[in-house]
């Protein structure tokens, strides 16, 4: 009887260690993966700040779908605070610099169902609460939001450079009814690479390496901004 109890206790302890070890190992793996990522190098955001911030976490996961472009020499900027004529700033989530143009990406790390029309000022996120019940949240039209970003960017770059607008939603949500009639791309994180490649394959324009580098250097001064700039941005856009 004593041996049986001892064996049961040992098994329970081993099971407890196993249950604790899995999330710890997962956390360590994710930490190491993040520390070696291009997103970490570009933004200097700490792992914990990204881990606990839904917006930054979405940008990080989105950035991983851009690794194929970065592996061929393309550059990215994240959290770019572009000055506007009115003294305010536009916070751009991601800019991909490609010989075919600039891809300005608005990241939406949302869940639930998404409803929206390009011409409507607000879109709707529907979240399940319990069976037969749901909760609705309105959010500003991301196409209009990104259009503001692009207008701000245009003030700082060569007029001949093509700029493409892409709205990328997390795969945790479903684009239930989204109507877009312009050339703006609304897609999921997982389809981002394919969406950008479709634009690239249909473009006959090419930016010279010199102009592309100049553009990157010019816009990079607006990334990795200090804390006061971020606070001022929030205050100005209340």
List PLM regions with ranges.
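Surface-exposed interaction regions that form or flank ligand-binding interfaces
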Residues: 2-90, 97-102, 108-113, 129-238
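Short, flexible, mixed-charge acidic loops at enzyme active sites
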Residues: 114-126
């Amino acid at each position: 009887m004593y041996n049986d109890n001892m064996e049961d206790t040992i098994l329970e302890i081993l099971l407890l260690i196993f249950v604790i070890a899995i999330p710890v190992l997962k956390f360590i793996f994710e930490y190491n993966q993040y520390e070696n990522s291009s997103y970490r190098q570009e933004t200097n955001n700490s792992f914990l700040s990204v881990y606990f911030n839904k917006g930054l976490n979405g940008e990080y996961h989105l950035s991983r779908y851009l690794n194929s472009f970065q592996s061929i020499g393309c550059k990215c900027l994240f959290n770019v605070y572009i000055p506007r004529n009115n003294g305010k700033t536009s916070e751009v989530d991601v800019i991909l610099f490609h010989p075919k143009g600039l891809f300005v990406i608005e990241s939406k790390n949302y869940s639930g169902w998404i409803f929206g029309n390009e011409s409507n000022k607000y879109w709707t996120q529907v979240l399940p609460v319990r069976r037969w019940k749901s909760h609705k949240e309105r959010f500003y039209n991301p196409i209009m939001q990104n259009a503001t970003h692009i207008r701000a960017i245009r003030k700082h770059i060569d007029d001949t450079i093509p700029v493409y607008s892409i709205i990328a939603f997390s795969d945790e949500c479903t684009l239930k009814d989204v109507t877009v009639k312009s050339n703006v791309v609304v897609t999921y994180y997982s389809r981002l690479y394919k969406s950008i490649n479709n634009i690239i394959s249909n473009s006959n324009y090419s930016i010279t390496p010199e102009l592309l580098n100049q553009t990157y250097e010019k816009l990079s001064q607006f990334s990795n901004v200090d804390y006061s700039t971020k606070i001022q941005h929030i205050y100005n856009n209340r």
